């Protein structure tokens, strides 16, 4: 499922996501992007504080869910309300930095799901416990810890062997692929994996091959 937010979302990026996850959910102001593209969403939801005043006639029968609470992001609301096995978020990166950070937080909250954020330049997802990623050699690949996490990797220019990454200390940005097969193993659901946007399909396969993290229960 593709979740379309109100942030920067060029049509080619939306179309690339829809090619992988063709059901569209418009998240608040993302409905304007959908209308501009001529794509009809299956659902519109959010706190609805940034929707356009008028919607196209084709949108008149679409279910609308108003979620006024302000304790979570619209992206988080969307993942909770209309869950999917594969969730691609477009229009959530490249705008306000605080919105971006909140969406990275949402990746951690939904670590049990296959969630990827897609922009014109990057794909961002959460590293599962252990999985294999296949990318062309020399492809940029970054690991960013959201909290201390022990990482083991192979197939990168600078591999890790049960080493700690920590946002207060050592991070793993601007690494690159050095072998046909990259393995990434994480001790906890806490490390972002960032790759060029043209490798969306490979990142989806990377997430889908792992059992993922257990769902946290309240």
Spans of features found by a protein language model:
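Short N-terminal binding/cap micro-motifs at the start of the first secondary-structure element
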Residues: 10-13, 33, 202
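Acidic/Gly/His-enriched mid-domain segments of enzyme catalytic cores or analogous surface patches
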Residues: 17-20, 25, 29-120
